[in-house]
Amino acid sequence: MANHKSAEKRARQTIKRTERNRFYRTRLKNMTRAVKEAVEAKDVDAAKAALKVVNQNFHSFVSKGFLKKETASRHVSRLAKLVNSLVA
């Protein structure tokens, strides 16, 4: 347990940040899984729709500071490549 006022505040902030990061990480994993499942099911429309949602959310997480721009672009690019392989 923290003994100083500033240490107590840092502990509170760490808890909040951890919960927020867990929420973002879970959302990203679920959205990515939705795209991959649609590709495995060979459902082009669902894959494209899921990819659009992934793209929007990844870049919104960039603006919130959860991801770096290059990281989000890399993930979206790889998922787009999967979806395009299904279309082609």
Curated annotation (Swiss-Prot):
<dbReference type="GO" id="GO:0070181">
    <property type="term" value="F:small ribosomal subunit rRNA binding"/>
</dbReference>
<dbReference type="InterPro" id="IPR036510">
    <property type="entry name" value="Ribosomal_bS20_sf"/>
</dbReference>
<feature type="region of interest" description="Disordered">
    <location>
        <begin position="1"/>
        <end position="20"/>
    </location>
</feature>
<dbReference type="GO" id="GO:0003735">
    <property type="term" value="F:structural constituent of ribosome"/>
</dbReference>
<keyword id="KW-0689">Ribosomal protein</keyword>
<protein>
    <recommendedName>
        <fullName>Small ribosomal subunit protein bS20</fullName>
    </recommendedName>
</protein>
<comment type="similarity">
    <text>Belongs to the bacterial ribosomal protein bS20 family.</text>
</comment>
<dbReference type="GO" id="GO:0006412">
    <property type="term" value="P:translation"/>
</dbReference>
<keyword id="KW-0699">rRNA-binding</keyword>
<keyword id="KW-0694">RNA-binding</keyword>
<keyword id="KW-0687">Ribonucleoprotein</keyword>
<comment type="function">
    <text>Binds directly to 16S ribosomal RNA.</text>
</comment>
<dbReference type="GO" id="GO:0005829">
    <property type="term" value="C:cytosol"/>
</dbReference>
<dbReference type="GO" id="GO:0015935">
    <property type="term" value="C:small ribosomal subunit"/>
</dbReference>
<dbReference type="Pfam" id="PF01649">
    <property type="entry name" value="Ribosomal_S20p"/>
</dbReference>
<dbReference type="InterPro" id="IPR002583">
    <property type="entry name" value="Ribosomal_bS20"/>
</dbReference>
